[in-house]
Amino acid sequence: MKFAEHLSAHITPEWRKQYIQYEAFKEMLYAAQDQAPSIEVTDEDTVKRYYAKFEEIFFQTCEKELAKINTFYSEKLAEAQRRSATLQNELQSSLDAQRESSAIPGLRQRRKAVFALTHEERVQHRNIKDLKLAFSEFYLSLILLQNYQNLNFTGFRKILKKHDKILETSRGADWRVAHVEVAPFYTCKKINQLISETETVVTNELESGDRQKAMKRLRVPPLGAAQPAPAWTTFRVGLYCGIFIVLNMAIIMAGSHYLLGKDVWPMVRIYRGGFLLIEFLFLLGINTYGWRQAGVNHVLIFELNPRNNLSHQHLFEIAGFLGILWCFSLFSCIFGLWINLQMHLNPLILYGLMLLFLVNPTKTFYYKSRFWLLKLLFRVFTAPFHKVGFADFWLADQLNSLAVILMDLEFMICFYSFELKWGDSDGLVNSANSVCNSYSYGVRAVVQCIPAWLRFIQCLRRYRDTKRAFPHLVNAGKYSTTFFMVTFAALYSTHKERNHSDAQVFFYLWIIFYLISSCYTLIWDLKMDWGLFDRNAGENTFLREEIVYPQKAYYYCAIIQDVILRFAWTIQISVTSLNLFTDAGDIISTVLAPLEVFRRFVWNFFRLENEHLNNCGEFRAVRDISVAPLNADDQTLLEQMMDQDDGVKNRVKSRIWKRSQSMSLRRPRLSSQSKMKDAKILIDDTDDEANT
């Protein structure tokens, strides 16, 4: 592998601009070689002066790169030393508290027998668990810094050796000895000492001297590296997807033959939510694949466990498996009379199995990922009582696009409670009324507002924590427009059913607030969530200064589809109002629901890209984990202090200036990455010029 590819494959994405600009140096050397005056048409002194002037510029550039690397390495090393001291103090405090609580073993055992663990013991246990996680993240940051050290030294050695070969001189090697080999980033071995100390502390203090267990906890692949799925997983993905496609075609043919002339809408509404969930999981798998390929570190952004998280193939497998269950359940509905199973039992069995898959307490079927999702859902639905993180409001945003699932769930509960004729074998296609699909009792309107309400209270909670009206209160205003839109839609629907004369008034109010909501959310999507239409976009017209994905066309197409799908509701209202054909509203809404999931799928790419660029600007490469976090008041006070004119603002300006000096970010395919041993990057030190 060429070193340029090796460097691109193994750098930490969030520190990309702090590495040696190896490709730029190569271009300098090749350009100098191509533009050099020929010895055949000019004298030797002119050629020597040309190369002498070039070398002066070349070595000045090397000095600037070396100074940049030394500065960044020193800052990160100092940060690591401070973090190490903090973790050591927290560990010592936890161990001291643990020893004090166990000083009277008899009393402690009696307490355990009667009251199980005391509150103090539970807190200590939780602190030790948090410390293990904090040390593993800290160890990862040390490995990344060691990797930074090794890659930059190898980069200088390679480029200076190439310099000597092209210019037929030894001044590059001399410069390396005089400058690089004595540079602080290379000579400083404190990083190795910190790594060794961390391994020792985790082994002796947290894993009771079991080094194998300690190293298993510490060793981790680099963030952003694709975790190869087993061959059987790949096989199952292909098998499930193939079966799902074939079954869907069979369902369409069977349904058009056996259900012709029947009222299939209750069955469609009941099964529609399951299909949208399967579509969402499959598209999320594509999101995950795209993020990995582009170098968007979603593992860090979602604060996932880098040792154990779902890859795109795992998501495809889950979506395919659930898709097959969904198809078999629908088949059983259609052919219920032939298999002696009442039609209305099939959805209950299907969604019961899906729920069981999610809450299964055994450590099987991606237990850690399912438990992470359940905790996240709990945090989303109890938003006012927790500090809101990125994963929390990201999931709530997904729920806003999956609101149809909640509405279909409400319909299913209502239908089974009031409309279903349990004695009929074909109850799902033999409904006498459609009360459950209306706003008659107001429950449907409340359910429709739940996702927007969750984001609304999240924004209020973030405002409480940060005291920043913009963007949090402004964002809350965006979600509040949904409440008005749904309210007037419900009023219009109920007044129209009862032939009230004021129905048209509510219709126009509904349209006005729908229009306001769509414009509000569209502007927020493009400007705030995606960071587009930046004044400093430069050559990236209408985009932003830095872009991750390789083609600008991706961004322009995403803007167009977002505009179209944000206003797709106008088609539904127009067709429904004009009554162009039977069941127009149901047909259009069934088509638009998966399109909204697709819009959110596209939104995810650019929302995480924007968050990734924020992490790059802050050089944040690992999770921030603290055993003793600041409370909300202290956090607010600290942020206010940092906002002073002589504080962090100057650093922000400096970061903006630095970002303006760089080109678009792009990470090559991760297939070129090599495996790590003990989570340490091994740099190929070969001197073979074919590999440079």
Curated annotation (Swiss-Prot):
GO function terms (MF aspect): efflux transmembrane transporter activity; inositol hexakisphosphate binding; phosphate transmembrane transporter activity
Lineage: superkingdom: Eukaryota
Annotated localization: Cell membrane
The EXS domain, residue ranges: 435-639
Cytoplasmic side of membrane: 1-236, 291-317, 368-375, 423-469, 525-692
Region (Important for inositol polyphosphate binding): 158-165
Keyword Nucleotide-binding annotated: no
Residues that span the membrane, as ranges: 237-257, 270-290, 318-338, 345-367, 376-396, 402-422, 470-492, 504-524
Region of interest called Disordered, as start-end residue ranges on this chain: 660-692
Chain's role: Plays a role in phosphate homeostasis. Mediates phosphate export from the cell. Binds inositol hexakisphosphate (Ins6P) and similar inositol polyphosphates, such as 5-diphospho-inositol pentakisphosphate (5-InsP7); these are important intracellular signaling molecules.
Comment block on domains: The SPX domain has high affinity for inositol polyphosphates, such as myo-inositol hexakisphosphate and 5-diphospho-myo-inositol pentakisphosphate (5-InsP7). Its affinity for inorganic phosphate is tow to three orders of magnitude lower.
Family of this protein: Belongs to the SYG1 (TC 2.A.94) family.
Protein name stated in the entry: Xenotropic and polytropic retrovirus receptor 1 homolog
Organism: Xenopus tropicalis (Western clawed frog)
